[in-house]
Amino acid sequence: MLQPKRTKFRKQFTGKNRGLAFSGGKVSFGEYALRAQDRGRLTARQIEAARRAMTRHIKRGGKIWIRVFPDVPVTKKPLEVRMGKGKGNVEYWVCKVQPGRILYEMEGVSEEIAREAFKLAAAKLPIKTQFVTRTVM
C-alpha cells in the first residue's frame, strides 16, 4: 500500500480541505483520466482498490498512472481508552483531494474500455468523479 517512506514528523494536525485543485488538474501522461468532482479524503486502501479494479479490467493492455499519493497520517486512539494521555497512533494514510484534481490516467486502450475501467474504479472511491480525455491544443 502507498505511504511515505519517511516524514519529518510522525503526526500532523487534521487541517482543512478547502478550495479547488490548482495543481494536478491537467491530463499529463495518458490519454484518458478520472477527475474528482467533490472534495474528500482518499485512503491508501481506496486508492489501491480502485487501481486493482482498473488493472483487472484492462488486463495486459494499456498503462495506468496514479496521480495522487496518501501523505497525511490519520491517528486513532485504541478502543475503550479514555480521552487524554496524548494523541493516538497513526492508523492509516490519506490524500486530501479537491474538485478538479486528476486521480488516475490511462493510455493504450480504447475509449470504451477506459470508460468502463474508470467506472469500476469510481465505485471504489468515496467521491464523485468524471471521465475526461486529453485535449490537444
Swiss-Prot record:
Family: Belongs to the universal ribosomal protein uL16 family.
Domain of life: Bacteria
Biological processes per GO annotation: translation
Function: Binds 23S rRNA and is also seen to make contacts with the A and possibly P site tRNAs.
Keyword list, A-Z: Ribonucleoprotein, Ribosomal protein, RNA-binding, rRNA-binding, tRNA-binding
Name of the protein: Large ribosomal subunit protein uL16
Pfam families: Ribosomal_L16
A GO term, aspect molecular function: tRNA binding
GO cellular component term, pick one: cytosolic large ribosomal subunit
Assembly description: Part of the 50S ribosomal subunit.
UniProt xrefs under PANTHER family: 50S/60S RIBOSOMAL PROTEIN L16, LARGE RIBOSOMAL SUBUNIT PROTEIN UL16M
Source species of the chain: Thioalkalivibrio sulfidiphilus (strain HL-EbGR7)
CDD domains (alphabetical): Ribosomal_L16_L10e (cd01433)
Gene3D superfamilies: Ribosomal protein L10e/L16
